[in-house]
């Protein structure tokens, strides 16, 4: 159900936006306004409470891992952060668009046959995972209960909601072992359909073997989400080891 913004509609909201920009409401021709949590992130014991942990935990961890990975002239490390994942990815800035495959093809062309180079690559689809909520444990499969601060989550789905397969799962688990990082597995409850990620979309467009992984969160998609402090460090270390193994 769509509800009216707390400030009302039309003029009052536009006047507030115009005033903050030093304009008049008449100067605004069109707008894209998004509300956001104004509170700073807060560490509460062994938990981090903040907005947009889905999916900034993955973006930050991936960037840190790339910076930590050793340079290798034989390999090219790529980090792609897309928009519009929560609304289907069908946009020029989303994973359903052609941007990534075009960029990879152009970059690979400078090092040889693009098709061969891309065929020898592997992809991590990094997106937050649902940790078991203590009040609703029945929403999860009874044998797969990801917990906060117990390591990054490997996501598997027979209906291809996630792109992981036996080969890429093995690569991920070996990377976690090499990094000394605990890891968990999420398989959805058959009675509760799970969401998806851009993993299957990107894997389909690029033809790349892909593994779906992420940090477990509580209260995902709320204005303020919760994750384990240790899990962020675990995720960086696991991704760094994955990059190293791929080189």
Residues covered by each model-derived region:
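N-terminal hydrophobic/helix-forming segments and targeting peptides
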Residues: 1-247
């Amino acid at each position: 159900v769509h509800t009216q913004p707390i400030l009302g509609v039309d003029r009052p909201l536009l006047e507030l936006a115009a005033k903050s920009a030093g304009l008049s409401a008449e100067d605004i021709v069109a707008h894209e306004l998004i509300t956001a949590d104004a509170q700073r992130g807060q560490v509460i014991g062994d938990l981090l409470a903040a907005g947009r942990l889905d999916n900034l935990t993955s973006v930050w961890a991936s960037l840190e891992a790339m910076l930590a990975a050793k340079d290798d002239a034989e390999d090219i490390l790529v980090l792609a952060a897309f928009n519009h994942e929560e609304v289907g990815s069908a946009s020029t800035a989303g994973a359903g668009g052609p941007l990534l495959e075009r960029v990879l093809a152009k970059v690979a062309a400078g090092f040889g046959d693009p098709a061969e180079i891309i065929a020898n690559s592997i992809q991590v689809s990094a997106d937050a995972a649902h940790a078991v909520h203590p009040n609703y444990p029945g929403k999860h499969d009874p044998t797969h209960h990801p917990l906060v601060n117990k390591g990054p989550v490997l996501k598997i789905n027979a209906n291809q909601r996630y792109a992981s397969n036996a080969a890429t799962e093995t690569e991920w688990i070996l990377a976690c072992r090499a990094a000394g990082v605990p890891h968990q597995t999420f398989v959805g409850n058959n009675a509760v359909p799970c969401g998806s990620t851009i993993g299957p979309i990107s894997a389909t467009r690029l033809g790349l073997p892909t593994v779906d992984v992420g940090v477990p969160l509580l209260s995902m998609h709320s204005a303020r989400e919760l994750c384990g402090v240790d899990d962020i460090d675990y995720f960086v270390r696991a991704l760094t080891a994955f990059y190293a193994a791929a080189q």
